[in-house]
Amino acid sequence: DRIYEALEKFDPKKKIKKIIHLQGDLPNVSKKLIVSLADIIKNNKCIATPVVQADKNEILDENIVKCAASFKNPKPKIGEIGNALYFSRCPIPWGDSIKWHHLGIYGWDRSILEKYIKLKPSNLEMSEKLEQLRALEAGINIKILITNEKPIGIDTISDLKKFKKSINDY
């Protein structure tokens, strides 16, 4: 909702048709990942967002959003694009399958964003506290891009210390 409000102020004549929505708490997102999301929305009226394979410490962490997605390949590889089925703070899907850590970066087709902001928050969205569930419940396609990048999310003081260390190590 906030991204649309900013877009309306920045582009009231609606010339911009594709939007990349970056999060301030993910300061080290690569240009390559941004371009990859832009490529997906270039020819698709959808939302696009990346996932990376979750490590075992992240699977049970409720601060890490997981994504259940379908891919054509049963063992999808980096760069493959699939479709989101559900997002949760719980480990999904069940069993031994790969758990995907959702990175909170989005590519939007403007018409999809305009449709999205007219929707009321959904029951699942309010239950999980995940806004992307509103889109899924409304039948909006969310394309999932597998990446090997894992930008450092800064949600706690500990995360900030990790990020500062990564900059100093660079």
Model-assigned labels for residue ranges:
Residues 9, 62-64, 164:
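One-carbon transfer enzymes
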Residues 19-22, 48-50, 116, 143-147:
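Short beta-strands and strand-loop turn motifs
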Residues 1-22, 26-36:
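Short phosphate-binding loop-to-helix
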Residues 8-12, 42, 168:
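Residue-level signal for alpha-helix termini/capping positions
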Residues 97-170:
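Conserved alpha/beta core of the MobA/IspD/sugar-nucleotide pyrophosphorylase nucleotidyltransferase superfamily
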